């Protein structure tokens, strides 16, 4: 009797563990297939169709291929793989003539990879994560253990941010990824955090192109925003109503204001440098002022939930990219804040993977 593939239930723990181990080497393929799908605009093509259900041939006819018939056969395998990862839904129907017709449509998960009404998505961040420049650095992970090397520096001979300054393509890729991720996170932050109410002025330290402040001021138009970053960064920043772009160096001094934002700044620094930046923030605040740190918080113990997996994954990313960079626990943030002179710290909200941590001067 032939073994049926339908309704298979595997309950043997030893078999399950071995099957998981066999699947581990396949993890690379998901990111690489997603990279190809985004570069080919597959998700956007499906989203823009009138039915939002397309066959591999219908998709292939909309991408720059010389032979849609041949390409659709390869594309079909890509689409089936994505469906197996819950990134597409596979629909199989029979035509009147008895032939099988297969179409694919988006799932809630793949919706995050297409542009929303503001033109943002997770796709640019995935392209950054799978770019050969960063991937090449991963091959030197063992050198961080054996030689104390920074993997990115070992791979490319320079610090990550210095590399971005020399490679306009990579710099553009990085900026686009950060812009999209910031837009997505800040939409949630202004929804879940009310600590900006009643504030007259906000300083965003390392604010890049001013996207975080723009999101805040869109909800609180009476706030004056100062977007503080290096001169070569803010020179390309767009004009926003209510925001002044100020060039400077956070290592020297920070503009004075009642509320200072540090978003995704501390995790790229070692502890000593974190304290230096936090001390400069402390000096720039009035006695009743506060810093709002927006970072991931690493759990004390590794767990298998999404928050834990993302935090420990990004911790590896920081180890690859920066000397002393790391994700930190709540206690580690408290220790840094106290060393810098802050008297009270409170975790007040979460937006996706980022936590909002208030540091009070007095």
UniProtKB/Swiss-Prot annotation:
Binding site for S-adenosyl-L-methionine: 229
EC numbers for this chain: 2.1.1.267, 2.1.1.-
Catalytic activity, as annotated: myricetin + S-adenosyl-L-methionine = laricitrin + S-adenosyl-L-homocysteine + H(+); laricitrin + S-adenosyl-L-methionine = syringetin + S-adenosyl-L-homocysteine + H(+); a 3'-hydroxyflavone + S-adenosyl-L-methionine = a 3'-methoxyflavone + S-adenosyl-L-homocysteine + H(+); a 5'-hydroxy-3'-methoxyflavone + S-adenosyl-L-methionine = a 3',5'-dimethoxyflavone + S-adenosyl-L-homocysteine + H(+)
pH effect summary: Optimum pH is 7.5 with myricetin as substrate (in the presence of S-adenosylmethionine).
Tissues in which the protein is found: Mainly expressed in leaves secreting glandular trichomes types 1 and 4 and, to a lesser extent, in storage trichomes type 6.
Domain of life: Eukaryota
Function statement: Flavonoid 3'/5'-O-methyltransferase involved in the biosynthesis of polymethoxylated flavonoids natural products such as myricetin derivatives, aroma compounds possessing antioxidant properties and exhibiting pharmacological activities such as anti-carcinogen, anti-viral, anti-thrombotic, anti-diabetic, anti-atherosclerotic, and anti-inflammatory effects. Catalyzes S-adenosylmethionine-dependent regioselective 3'/5'-O-methylation of flavonoids; active on various hydroxylated flavonoid substrates, including myricetin and quercetin, but inactive toward kaempferol.
Family assignment from sequence similarity: Belongs to the class I-like SAM-binding methyltransferase superfamily. Cation-independent O-methyltransferase family.
Descriptive protein name: Myricetin 3'/5'-O-methyltransferase 1
Taxonomic source organism: Solanum habrochaites (Wild tomato)
Protein's gene: MOMT1
């Amino acid at each position: 009797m032939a073994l049926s593939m339908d309704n298979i239930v595997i309950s043997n723990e030893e078999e399950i563990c071995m099957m998981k181990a066999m699947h581990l080497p396949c993890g690379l393929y998901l990111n690489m297939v997603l990279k190809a799908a985004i570069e080919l605009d597959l998700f956007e093509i499906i989203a823009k169709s009138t039915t939002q259900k397309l066959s591999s041939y219908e998709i292939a006819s909309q991408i720059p291929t010389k032979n849609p018939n041949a390409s659709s056969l390869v594309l079909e395998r890509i689409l089936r793989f994505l469906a197996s990862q819950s990134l597409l839904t596979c629909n199989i129907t029979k035509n009147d003539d008895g032939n099988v017709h297969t179409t694919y449509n988006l799932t809630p998960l793949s919706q995050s990879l297409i542009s929303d009404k503001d033109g943002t998505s997770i796709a640019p961040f995935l392209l950054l994560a799978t770019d050969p420049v960063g991937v090449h650095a991963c091959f030197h992970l063992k050198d961080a253990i054996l030689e104390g090397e920074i993997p990115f520096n070992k791979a490319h001979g320079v610090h990550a941010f210095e590399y971005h300054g020399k490679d306009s393509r990579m710099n553009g890729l990085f900026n686009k990824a950060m812009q999209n991720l910031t837009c997505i996170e800040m939409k949630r932050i202004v929804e879940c955090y009310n600590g900006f109410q009643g504030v007259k002025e906000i300083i965003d330290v390392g604010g890049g192109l001013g996207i975080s402040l723009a999101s805040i001021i869109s909800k609180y138009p009476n706030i004056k925003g100062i977007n503080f970053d290096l001169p070569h960064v803010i020179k390309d920043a767009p004009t926003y109503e209510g925001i002044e772009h100020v060039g400077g160096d956070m290592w020297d001094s920070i503009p004075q204001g009642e509320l200072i934002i540090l978003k995704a700044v501390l995790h790229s620094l070692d502890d000593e440098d974190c304290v230096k930046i936090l001390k400069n923030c402390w000096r720039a605040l009035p006695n009743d002022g506060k810093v709002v740190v927006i970072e991931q918080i690493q759990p004390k113990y590794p767990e298998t939930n999404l928050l834990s997996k993302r935090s420990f994954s990004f911790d590896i990313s920081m180890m690859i990219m920066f000397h002393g960079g790391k994700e930190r626990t709540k206690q580690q943030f408290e220790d840094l804040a106290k060393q810098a002179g802050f008297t009270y710290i409170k975790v007040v909200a979460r937006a996706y993977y980022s936590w909002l941590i208030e540091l009070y001067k007095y």
